[in-house]
């Protein structure tokens, strides 16, 4: 062998050994990436009988992050609207909560629109990005809409970047799951088609993408064979190129795998944390990586944990707004239900009737007065014991307007019939006996002062309710609400105020005193 050839081989071999990239790749066998998620927090910053609170959630997430060097924390939507605390503070502590957990991306939930699309686009201040690939703005909407996806990255053991594309998807139910005025100028497109477009076209412009995650505010559960509840979402796990799906909306605890794709949902109100882990392996003679799902968990948030800074922020607002003021005492549990008329539904709707009486002349109250509320607007239960202002307000956290309309008996029957058969839950009511033939309302009796009488088809009555369903929310018939009681409606009374006022007027509440409708079925 010539000296020149020996020198060439020595130089070549030393370069090979000293090459950082090749040396690192030789040493690097596998790495792990973790996705930590939560969903449907709904602004439940304060710990109560329902939620562990923001302080416990933050600390629990940070503890999970500490065990995973490459952890990404994301939200599947419905972050700020849904608690009275959040309504009053306009979600003010959310930016701090996201900052402390390191959340930088979220799906758009239907309740993200409760304060208007302008708030979502410009006034929400979390240091993060809302993504929605299946929401498109009409030309006259006035602003470009939110991005369809966001790419996050970390550095693996070998020094190479690992890039994850999160594609946002939102339930098309948003069109009737928030007030119609809040989504004017927006179209909610088919989720599968929207995600497929991002995968097939737009992500290709972003260079090498190592992993794709669908970050969805779409309902899932463990009882449905396809896992996804909405018909237009059931094929999402079969979309080529998708590595994981993180979901929300249905408030269920879900950990499933369809077509080899892990699907997770972490309950609601911060009660659970979702965790998916993936083994990352280099593909020989390639810059690409093999992504393999190696396990997941839905971890119950530890209510005993506290993050000091988050706790101090929440306490500041509790004191400012007197959230701990005691209003009354419940001698029994007062529970809601979407399947039948409930104690909580009767209590809420009775408060509307009493508020109407309190604020209107006596001659305006001579007609039968019936309170109603859509099932989805009653968000919580009250349990035996003292009830403070925040606990009461969290029953009606959206704080809509309480309004009144003139109805005939025939219109009332239609409203109650529609409400009994509404797929979003039974319409709640008070001061009634409802005669049912199967699932159809045959007749309605008005019950007051220990007496009852049939409300005839042509007889006038007044329905007092929250304004959400009056413009078609939850798929109710807006044509029923054509004769407003303007002298009441123009005062812009708030549902939550009416309910709190009602509770304060009662030193003690017994379940037996709540005017829950009675049902009489035809044999």
For each feature predicted by the language model, list its residue ranges:
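Residue-level detector of intrinsically disordered/flexible regions characterized by low predicted structural confidence
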Residues: 6-8, 259, 281, 520
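Residue-level detector of intrinsically disordered, flexible termini
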Residues: 9, 20-23, 70, 243, ...
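Low-complexity, intrinsically disordered or weakly predicted helical/coil tracts enriched
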Residues: 10, 225-226, 440, 447
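Acidic, metal/ion-coordinating pockets
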Residues: 25-298, 343-355, 362-371, 402-406, ...
